[in-house]
């Protein structure tokens, strides 16, 4: 029995990857199968990966598939990370350790020379950016009194910036949920934290981000309108919120 994972690779078809067998107590053999767009197998690659490391997330861009592996370090109550980079149009495949500062990575995305890793840990939204040529790691952390939930990560390629969204859910129903937006350059060198102004009687419950060709941003999501601050009187709706030149619009 094998636990298969896959990644769609655009014009390069798709890859399927799985742990094939255990070489010794420290090392496992993994297989990567590449298929073209007609689902004909074109390559079979084997690579040795530390035993007990498991794939957490993968992302395809510009002929490369990046696969993030996590191995728990129970002694230090932390995680050890590895990045496998598979090149679809070449035999080049490599595995490198990553010095990430977060333990609960749930999503990765790659653009240009950067790999973005987003975590949703206890009460904290965090993200690491890896500069792939040097493997240097930087971090952004969004901490708040409220319990937070990661909403999106979008890249504005026109203006070379990164947008990370997080919902702030209240601990008690009397408090209104808000939304936080991290607006950063690609390398996390400079960033600003923006928040929705709290709207009377509205709880934000979802958010997605769309970036236009002109660089304008539209935030779209759902909300609950609470007329009497009772769960039985919640009415769901949809909002659209423009974000231009570092300023939020109004719901």
Which ranges hold each PLM region?
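Beta-propeller domains
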Residues: 15-47
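Well-ordered mid-protein domain cores that form the structural environment of catalytic cofactors
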Residues: 37, 44, 49-50, 57-108
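Short beta-strand elements that form the blades of beta-propeller/WD-repeat-like
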Residues: 5-25, 57-58, 62-75, 106-121, ...
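A short beta-strand motif characteristic of beta-propeller blades
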Residues: 1, 41-47, 91-98, 136-144, ...
